[in-house]
Amino acid sequence: MYCIVCLANEAYAQHVAVMLTSLFYQNPQKSFRIFLMTNTMTENTKKKLIHVVESHGELFFLEDDYNNLGIAMLKSETSTKSWNPIMYLKLLIPQKLPVDLERFLFLDVDMIINHDIDELYNTNLDGYILAACDDYKYQQAHRDRLGLKEKDEYINSGVMVIDLKAWREKEKQYQMINFLENNKELLNNDQDGFALYFRGEIKLLPNKWNVTTFYFEQTPRILDKYLSEVNELRSHPYIIHFCEPIKPWFTDCKHPYQYLYKKYLKQTPWSDYKFPFFISPLSVKFWKSELKYWLNRCGIRKDSMNLISLK
């Protein structure tokens, strides 16, 4: 039985369905226990998600309205930063999951699973508490801001294999909520919290397990030692992470794998979804963006931030 943990509110329920549908498609012979942490979700939406999961395992809703005192305080004190409120629920994972659960795979919901997850789920943690991929885009800036050393990992927390038993043992010494409360002046998002709290206890995963939108930029600014990987990551991403503002559920998304989101969406109870625009097509900003995109596509302009198209 494969245990998956994810977070979503009512607004992101559709995207949970798409991500899980892709997971089940790529892993047809597996059974899953899905733990969905949420703060707001209607009964009708829950029924739709149960329908998505029922042929592949069990779905458990772990609900919380931030009534945990530590969460409430941290939420109040970091409200001006870039924390998405639903992300606070990550901090409650050790308390919310069943006591008999020792390992799980955490997945963000703005993803498409594009490969069998056996290798990922059964990662040898080698004594580390969690395994995840580097977050390259602003990695050095994050390290400098948080006071991390070169050997300390700054990860993208969208895909994590976690030894829950070891995390709970660590919590007995110093609860993550209390740790973050005492370091709140440093924190801009939940990834900062994971980097600091699990400092020295993180194993890096191969980048194929969390191929972020960053890798599809015209000239991604990553470490030279990883440049040789870029073409392979673009052509054969095992997990595609749509982690930029213009997500694949917007008409004006230019991500080359948006079509996979549309493919799996058709297999969910949200198949009649009408794609809105992220930027209004009536705005000057929209047409400037379109012009820049097509100038890049035609080779007239070279903008490092422009997303490539796959041939």
Per-range role (PLM):
Residues 1-2, 8, 18, 169-311:
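A glycosyltransferase accessory/donor-loop signature
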Residues 130-150, 254-257, 270:
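A short, conserved beta-to-alpha structural element at the edge of catalytic cores
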Residues 52-95:
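Active-site-proximal specificity loops/subdomain of glycosyltransferases
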Residues 66-69, 86-138, 152-154, 159-162:
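GT-A fold catalytic core of metal-dependent nucleotide-sugar glycosyltransferases
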Residues 22-31:
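Short, acidic, metal-binding catalytic loop of nucleotide-sugar glycosyltransferases
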Residues 159-171:
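Conserved nucleotide-sugar donor-binding
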